[in-house]
C-alpha cells in the first residue's frame, strides 16, 4: 500500500468549481484521503494498492487526467508528486511537525532514527 500526494496546477479557475470537481472525485475514488484547493492549484492525498512504487507513480501521473471528464476537473497538469510506503506515511503522522529544510546544506538525522 502506498500513500500518494499529487499537486496539480494550471490556469485560474473559480475556486468553487475546483472544490465541486474534487467533491465529485471523492465520490468516484473511495481511497481519496483528503484534498486541498485554490483557484490555480489542488493537492490530493490517497492510498494506492499498486504492487510496487513504479506502479503507484505511473498511476499517480495519470490520475488527474483520467478523471478530468468524469469529475469535471480543470485541465491542469501534475506539478508535484510524492509516493511513500504505509510505514513512512504513518510515522510522519505520529511525529511532531518539523520544517523540511532548516538550512541549505544541512545534514541531520531523520526523526525516529535509531542513532
Sequence positions of predicted segments:
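Long, contiguous binding/interaction regions
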Residues: 1-115
Amino acid at each position: 500500500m502506498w500513500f500518494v500526494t499529487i499537486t496539480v496546477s494550471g490556469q485560474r479557475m473559480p475556486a468553487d468549481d475546483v472544490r465541486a470537481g474534487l467533491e465529485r472525485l471523492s465520490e468516484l475514488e473511495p481511497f481519496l484521503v483528503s484534498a486541498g484547493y485554490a483557484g490555480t492549484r489542488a493537492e490530493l492525498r490517497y492510498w494506492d494498492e499498486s504492487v510496487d512504487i513504479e506502479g503507484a507513480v505511473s498511476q499517480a501521473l495519470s490520475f488527474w487526467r483520467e478523471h478530468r471528464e468524469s469529475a469535471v476537473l480543470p485541465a491542469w497538469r501534475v506539478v508535484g508528486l510524492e509516493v511513500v510506503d504505509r510505514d513512512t506515511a504513518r510515522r510522519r503522522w505520529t511525529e511532531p511537525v518539523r520544517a523540511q529544510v532548516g538550512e541549505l546544506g544541512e545534514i541531520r538525522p531523520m526523526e525516529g532514527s535509531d542513532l
